Every structure is written in C-alpha cells, then in structure tokens.
C-alpha cells in the first residue's frame, strides 16, 4: 500500500448514532468531493449538501467540510462527510466513494501516520491521540491531552537541544586540543552534563507517573482457600464482584476487576485458593492463579488471621514464598481483624509490608488503598503531567545510562571521543520518542493499534 493512495474510513464508532462521519485524505479527495457532492466546498466552511450515488440520486444529506492541504490534520487534502449515523447509510456512502479509482480503505491509524509523516505531529503526539481515546479516568484524559498538545515532546526536545549544545563543546575540545581553554578538564562540560542528567531524571519521574496513569498496576490476591480473597476483591471494587461463601474452593477461576485509586488504574485479580486439589476444575484454576501471580506487579498474600499468629510470610507458608518469582513485591494482608481484635494499620516485617484489616467489614481497606498507591510511587498532586508508554520509559532509561557512562569516561579518563559517542547515543535514544530516529517496523506496530478512522 502506498502513502500516495487516497484513503477513506469511518471516523465515528460503528453502530447506530445521530451522526456518522466518513473521512477522506489524499490527492483524490478533491475528485471525491466533485463526484459525491457535485462541487468543491469552500475551505473550512460547513456546507449542507446531498451525498450523491453514481446515478445522481441522493444517498444521504449532511455537512461537508473541505480542508485543502497542507492545512489539515494529515497535511493532505481532507474531506469530511457528516451524515446520519445509520450503519446501512454509512456503508452505502463508503461503497460509493470506493467506486472512484485510486481510493481505498484506510489501515488502522493511517490518518495519524500520515500526519506524522507530513510533520503535522511527532510520534509522541500521535500516540497521545490513541491514549486520549482509551483514557479510563479524567486524570488520564487530561494527561493524554497534554501530550497531544506537545508537553512531553517539549521536554524531550529540550533535552535533545541541551545534548546538541554539549556535543558542540566536546567536539570543540577534541578538534582543537591546542586551545588555551581545555573544555574537558575545566569543569564546564561536567557541570553541563550534570545539568542534563538532572533534567532527564525529572522527566523520567514524570514519565513513570504517566505510565502508571496509562498502564495501571496489576495486583493479584493469592492465598489459601477461605482466607477472604474474594471478600477483599469485593471491598476494593466497592461491589459484589465475586461470590463469597464459607465453602473452601468457591473461586475456581480468575476474576478481574478494574478500579481507580485517585486516578491510577488498578487491575485487581482474585484467584483460586492455593492447595493440592484433586478436583480437575479446581486444579486448572490453581494453575491459572500461578500464571497470574508470575505476571503481577504486586501480590497481596491473604492470610486468615484466625488460623495463625505469624506475620512473616516465610513462617506462614514457606513453600508459597519459595515459588514466587524473584523480586516480586509482596504485601501480607492479615484478614479478619474484626474477629481477632488486631489493631488495624500497616507495618513492616522482614522487608515486607503487613496490613491488618477486615475485608468483611471494610475496616482497614483505605489503608491498603493508600499502600498500593504509594508502593507504585503514584503522586496525585503532580499537575500538568503527560502520559507515557513503556517504550518511552525504555528510551529514557537508555539515554540516562549513556549519560552516566559518558560521565564516567569524562571523569575517569578525560576521554573526549568516548564521551562524544555516549552523548550521541543518548540523543538518539531520546529522538526515538518523538520519531526523529525510529525504525519503520516500530512505526508499523504503533499505528496498527489505532482506530481505523484515526
């Protein structure tokens, strides 16, 4: 498929609605207007017109908007037809447009891809369009809009410019070694490098917040049967999401709930009670429980406080702890404090967090909520943030690593050439975020996740 083709797609969600929009972009958009509308509308003015079939009969009537390139979303000629939102009507109009030579259905995200290729958006802004559509909270939506308006890109571009300036100094020190001022040893380059590292650390902190807003945190509730796992799921979700009985093994499959804690998405997973099961269905449920545990960001180790006084997970169930993935964070949740009379709250035991609560009464649930938020480093007071994806975090981490290696070369051996190379690599990593240096394969993966009409 060529970027010279003219593309068309429905820009509104499928199904019935008051308004349905078809978007056309490319060189043939002008021909589509002449054929379907009988005229070329005045640029950027709403024109109420009939939408005509091949024989001249009306298929629908509605608003036509004409945006000649380069002053359009894609940078190409763009025509938008806003008609009635019935699927049959839109399908008839789409088929009519596709009868014209050189016009084809758009690939997912192709409109945004063309906007990127025509320098109307950088890659981070293009990704923000999809993130804005998929936002699951008000805070995520606001942060996605900030990214779309260039907040994230501006921070990255500032770092790139600072690195460019620093590289000039380093290259000058390499190319003109006989000058009176030795830029490598007089401390100026070190001071500038430290400034860039500090700025990058600040951006990484904000990016981690943005990633939490977008990705959320996956928390798996695990433990023995009848420890109160399903009751905890219901308490966190604020509704009866799981069946709760006194019968051991009631939960046999994985149950998922998605909630928000001050804007941070939390993916809670209730699992089957872990034990040696003879029942085939329960055994499969336990296998799935372990699969979820291995992919978790944190495990809530649920303990029935009426069965043991132990608080160290290694003492409570050593075989369970031994099987957990290395470095997986664990929070021990001692349940049924309403029965045992334990003091509600949170403490630390041998490097693990310990929360005492009652899932049945809801006492102590707020303590657990705050603990989950703090354990991920989520800051609800951070204003003007932006959303970030995992690839952004990886690129920022790579840039930080190159800068630290460059600093080591500078202070350890005054190796200007090696410092210059590390600065170049750091700059390249940052430029991957905005798409200045990005492989075609990565671009294809990013835009293929978009809506068809975007």
UniProtKB/Swiss-Prot annotation:
The lineage of its organism: Bacteria, Pseudomonadati, Pseudomonadota, Gammaproteobacteria, Enterobacterales. Exhibits a very high intrinsic GTPase hydrolysis rate. Involved in the addition of a carboxymethylaminomethyl (cmnm) group at the wobble position (U34) of certain tRNAs, forming tRNA-cmnm(5)s(2)U34. InterPro entries: G_TrmE (IPR031168), GTP-bd (IPR006073), GTP-bd_TrmE_N (IPR018948), GTPase_MnmE (IPR004520), MnmE_dom2 (IPR027368), MnmE_helical (IPR025867), P-loop_NTPase (IPR027417), Small_GTP-bd (IPR005225). GTP binds at residues 226-231, 245-251, 270-273, 335-338, 358-360. Its EC number is 3.6.-.-. Belongs to the TRAFAC class TrmE-Era-EngA-EngB-Septin-like GTPase superfamily. TrmE GTPase family. Its main location: cytoplasm. This is tRNA modification GTPase MnmE. One of its GO terms (molecular function) is GTP binding. Residues 216-377 form the TrmE-type G domain. (6S)-5-formyl-5,6,7,8-tetrahydrofolate binds at residues 23, 80, 120, 454. One of its GO terms (cellular component) is cytosol. GO terms for biological process: tRNA methylation; tRNA wobble uridine modification. Homodimer. Heterotetramer of two MnmE and two MnmG subunits. K(+) binds at residues 226, 245, 247, 250. Keywords: Cytoplasm, GTP-binding, Hydrolase, Magnesium, Metal-binding, Nucleotide-binding, Potassium, tRNA processing. Mg(2+) binds at residues 230, 251. It is an enzyme of class 3 (hydrolase). CDD domains: trmE, TrmE_N. Binds 1 potassium ion per subunit. It is found in: Cytoplasm. NCBIfam families: mnmE_trmE_thdF, PRK05291.1-3, small_GTP.
């Amino acid at each position: 498929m060529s970027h010279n083709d003219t593309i068309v797609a429905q820009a509104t969600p499928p199904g019935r609605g008051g308004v349905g929009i078809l978007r056309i972009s490319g060189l043939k958009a002008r021909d589509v207007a002449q054929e379907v509308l009988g005229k070329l509308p005045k640029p950027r003015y709403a024109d109420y017109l009939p939408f005509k079939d091949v024989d001249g009969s009306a298929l629908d009537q509605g608003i036509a908007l004409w945006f000649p390139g380069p002053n359009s979303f894609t940078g190409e000629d763009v025509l938008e037809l806003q008609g009635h939102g019935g699927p049959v009507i839109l399908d008839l109009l789409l088929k009519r447009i596709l009868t014209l030579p050189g016009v084809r259905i758009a690939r997912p995200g192709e409109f945004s891809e063309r906007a990127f290729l025509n320098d109307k958006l950088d890659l981070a802004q293009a990704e923000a369009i999809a993130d804005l559509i998929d936002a699951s909270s008000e805070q995520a939506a606001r942060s996605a809009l900030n990214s779309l308006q260039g907040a994230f890109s501006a921070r990255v571009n500032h770092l790139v410019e600072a690195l460019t300036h620093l590289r000039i100094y380093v290259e000058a020190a390499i190319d003109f070694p006989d000058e009176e001022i030795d830029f490598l040893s007089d401390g100026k380059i070190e001071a500038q490098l430290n400034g860039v590292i500090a700025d990058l650390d600040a951006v990484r902190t904000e990016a981690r917040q943005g990633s939490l807003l977008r990705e959320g945190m996956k928390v798996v509730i695990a433990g023995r049967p009848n420890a109160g796992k399903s009751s905890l799921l219901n308490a966190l979700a604020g509704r009866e999401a799981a069946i709760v009985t006194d019968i051991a093994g009631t939960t046999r499959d994985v149950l998922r709930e998605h909630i928000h804690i001050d804007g941070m998405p939390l993916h809670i997973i209730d699992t089957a009670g872990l034990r040696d099961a003879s029942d085939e269905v329960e055994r499969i449920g336990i296998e799935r429980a372990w699969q979820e545990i291995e992919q978790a960001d944190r495990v809530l180790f649920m303990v029935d406080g009426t069965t043991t006084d132990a608080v160290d997970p290694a003492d409570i169930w050593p075989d369970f702890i031994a099987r957990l993935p290395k470095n997986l964070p664990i929070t021990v949740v001692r349940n049924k404090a309403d029965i045992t009379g334990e003091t509600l709250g949170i403490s630390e035991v041998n490097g693990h967090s310990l929360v005492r609560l009652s899932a049945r009464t809801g006492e102590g649930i707020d303590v657990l909520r705050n603990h989950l938020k703090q354990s991920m480093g989520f800051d609800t007071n951070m204003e003007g943030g932006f959303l970030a994806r995992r690839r952004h975090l990886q690129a920022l981490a790579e840039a930080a690593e190159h800068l630290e290696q460059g600093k080591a070369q500078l202070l350890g051996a005054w190796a200007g050439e090696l410092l210059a190379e590390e600065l170049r690599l750091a700059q390249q990593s940052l430029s991957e975020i905005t798409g200045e240096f990005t492989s075609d394969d990565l671009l294809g993966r990013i835009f293929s996740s978009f809506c068809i009409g975007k």
